[in-house]
């Protein structure tokens, strides 16, 4: 896999940046690490009017993204449990806060399609998490 660290961020340009860049091909290769998928009919239902998102996009872009988000959710939950056990908070009924994903962009760029697609794919993750969409209007209300 071809991983490229981002531009150095220190004064002497020796330490790589905090992010990595992957080609679409390298990212798509990560799709094999998950079996989560949707069929064409479901994708048709999710897509917005005139939205170009293809099943190939789902496989090459959204499946690896879903798996990565799933890993973050799982390990965030494990950290919550371990922290509560260490701090002896389990007896106080501390509840885990939701894992929130924000999607931003200009008007009519596909934010709703991305949100619906992630909701569908994440809902098919191994632990079958509850996934809700909260629109800006619903959030502000």
Predicted regions, residues:
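Short beta-strand-centered segment that lines the nucleotide-binding/catalytic pocket of NTP-utilizing
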Residues: 125-141
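Extreme N-terminal, non-catalytic leader segments
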Residues: 2-11, 17-100
């Amino acid at each position: 896999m071809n991983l490229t660290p981002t531009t150095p961020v220190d004064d002497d340009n020796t330490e790589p940046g905090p992010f990595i860049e992957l080609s679409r091909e390298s990212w798509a290769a990560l799709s094999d690490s998950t079996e989560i998928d949707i069929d064409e009919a479901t994708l048709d239902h999710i897509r917005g009017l005139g939205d170009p998102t293809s099943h190939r996009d789902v496989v090459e872009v959204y499946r690896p993204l879903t798996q990565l988000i799933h890993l973050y959710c799982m390990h965030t939950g494990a950290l919550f449990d371990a922290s509560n056990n260490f701090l002896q908070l389990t007896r106080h009924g501390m509840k885990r806060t939701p894992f929130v994903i924000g999607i931003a962009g200009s008007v009519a760029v596909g934010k709703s399609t991305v949100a619906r697609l992630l909701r569908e794919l994440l809902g098919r993750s191994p632990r079958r998490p509850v996934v809700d969409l909260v629109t800006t209007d619903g959030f502000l209300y």
